[in-house]
Amino acid sequence: MIMFCVQCEQTIRTPAGNGCSYAQGMCGKTAETSDLQDLLIAALQGLSAWAVKAREYGIINHDVDSFAPRAFFSTLTNVNFDSPRIVGYAREAIALREALKAQCLAVDANARVDNPMADLQLVSDDLGELQRQAAEFTPNKDKAAIGENILGLRLLCLYGLKGAAAYMEHAHVLGQYDNDIYAQYHKIMAWLGTWPADMNALLECSMEIGQMNFKVMSILDAGETGKYGHPTPTQVNVKATAGKCILISGHDLKDLYNLLEQTKGTGVNVYTHGEMLPAHGYPELRKFKHLVGNYGSGWQNQQVEFARFPGPIVMTSNCIIDPTVGAYDDRIWTRSIVGWPGVRHLDGEDFSAVIAQAQQMAGFLYSEIPHLITVGFGRQTLLGAADTLIDLVSREKLRHIFLLGGCDGARGERHYFTDFATNVPDDCLILTLACGKYRFNKLEFGDIEGLPRLVDAGQCNDAYSAIILAVTLAEKLGCGVNDLPLSLVLSWFEQKAIVILLTLLSLGVKNIVTGPTAPGFLTPDLLAVLNEKFGLRSITTVEEDMKQLLSA
């Protein structure tokens, strides 16, 4: 059987249409796993439909609220490739739905939900049979009836909500819960399960998702800073230190903290990778002296870099790609919603098996000459620099700020972002976040009167800090955010980037430049609408874009 998935930037693009629709997607996801993820999403939409109904009766089931976004997160690009676990999530969704339905019926014997997903049952235990059932829920199944524009808007909402669900899970792990957010999530997820076809309603929904995600990023920021302190500028070594070692990748700071606690006194050093790099800026994490540095570059290079790492690797969230290529599948471990067939999974927060494996391996035999980069420009630090930025602008020492961030990826056109960074004039500042920074974060950019020209604000969700800084600067200068000497040049890859974009658009931020390509699910008509409403456009050349942005 074949699949249909168009959710990430590397999706197949042909004159006949966009999307991975063969036996395997560009990410390595098989048609089986992709189709079963469609089935899981349908089950989650049915669960959300009953969660909405339950709230009408004052019933709030926290097991449902914690499970639903987490399971949805498992369908995000490069998270879970393990078909049996995807089916397990679908079964759990249905079991939770039936329990919630029973709670509703206990209050009102006539309780009903008008949603096509509300009574979904799995037809078999056989993966092949379930894959055939999943064909009913392929996202493009009614494309001929609704047209590409409606399908594109549905997917914009679905993928945006998926990105928000990921951030909800990150926040939930840190003890953050906001009933209004979960109520809104369930309402939108249930509505998408009705296969809506009204263009205006879908556009409004996309903006609602963006506004909701701003609140999600707020509680995630509160969770991270509340537990681990406010990030402050910190130098991080990106070269090896002699000793046994563990590499931890992803976004989950709690997993990193637990690993650091459990490796104290063991002689095992811990390295961050990918989006875990900003962890070094948090006081409660950098206090561990055996958190010795950051290893590697963008996630897309992991098959080479992980193969060379002389210790075990822990994946706490996206992005994982096929570990058998580099033959390190026997020493990579998955956590939480991450999965790869045949790879060992850690069900709880006990890392003793990983530590034991690290102690049996050689580790780095010698220390390399250190290469230090600076991270840790969190929200509090950025706000503390607001007056300095305004002073530099008023004295014409600082001409422009470029927010140059987002996802990294394998496409060659992404070298645009390296070229852009190196061509930013000396009187301009680069604010960066997310893993796109690996395109230029080891280069030297100097400073403007002591203020670094390259300012690393953190993970992708730390777009919240950048937004708060922009709002603060606008308030202090008595202008709108769009009137600031600030331009956003964003690289995208997956659904977290989509919801960040929706968040910015929902807040009224205009004239964003994105690349390296437009999302495959957005038609030329939809791109034209977004350009007309928000000034959103794709990158062209570094020279042309730089000239246009500096003259705006």
Curated annotation (Swiss-Prot):
Stretch forming the signal peptide: none
Q: What is its EC number?
A: 1.7.99.1
What does the UniProt entry say about where the protein is found? Answer: Cytoplasm
Q: Where does [2Fe-2S] cluster bind?
A: C5, C8, C20, C27
- Where is this chain primarily localised? cytoplasm
Q: Which Pfam families match?
A: Prismane
Q: Name the family.
A: Belongs to the HCP family.
Protein name, please?
Hydroxylamine reductase
Q: What organism, scientifically named, is this protein from? A: Shigella dysenteriae serotype 1 (strain Sd197)
The major lineage groups are: Bacteria, Pseudomonadati, Pseudomonadota, Gammaproteobacteria, Enterobacterales
Q: Source gene?
A: hcp
